[in-house]
């Protein structure tokens, strides 16, 4: 972002408290760009005796992660995670528990992760390039993003394996 969305003046960095924030260069405007993280929901999705991992279109061939997506306006995190499960893999979801909230600074997101049980037959959605069904004892957390939720879910089950680098 280079220009103020209110008056089109250039944005400049200014010290505000303990942070540098982009602010409007026009003294009469006062616009401040806070760059708040976007809320993302993620489902550690159990289907039968497996955990479902998905590969989004545009991801490298070997990358798989949890079903996840951005919240829609007016949607609760619980509604959002169930919608994402339906959109991405066609399953009716049932929330088992909240796993946790995780900062994902690299993408300027905060991830709200849920343990969800899926019912029905998997139907791959438009955004998904592939699906893997992984037995929980073979599931390994990855270091970024939703991998932290996998780590905590496995630890709560007493089955934490080594993190995949």
Residue map of PLM features:
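A short coil-to-beta-strand element that immediately follows conserved catalytic motifs
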Residues: 14-15, 92-100
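Acidic, metal-coordinating catalytic segment for phosphate/diphosphate chemistry
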Residues: 1-42
């Amino acid at each position: 972002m280079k220009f103020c969305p209110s008056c089109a003046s250039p944005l400049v960095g200014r010290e505000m408290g303990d942070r540098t924030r982009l602010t409007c260069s026009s003294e009469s405007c006062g616009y401040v760009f806070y760059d708040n993280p976007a809320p993302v929901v993620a489902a550690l999705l159990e289907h039968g005796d497996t955990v479902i991992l998905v590969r989004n279109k545009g991801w490298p061939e070997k990358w798989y992660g949890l079903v996840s997506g951005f919240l829609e306006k007016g949607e609760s995190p619980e509604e959002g995670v169930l919608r994402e499960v339906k959109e991405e893999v066609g399953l009716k979801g049932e929330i088992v528990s909240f796993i946790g909230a995780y900062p994902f600074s690299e993408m300027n997101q905060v991830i709200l992760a849920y343990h969800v049980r899926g019912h029905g037959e998997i139907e791959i959605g438009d955004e998904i390039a592939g699906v893997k069904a992984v037995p929980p004892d073979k599931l390994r957390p990855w270091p970024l993003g939703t991998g932290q939720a996998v780590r905590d879910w496995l630890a709560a089950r007493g089955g934490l394996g080594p993190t995949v680098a």
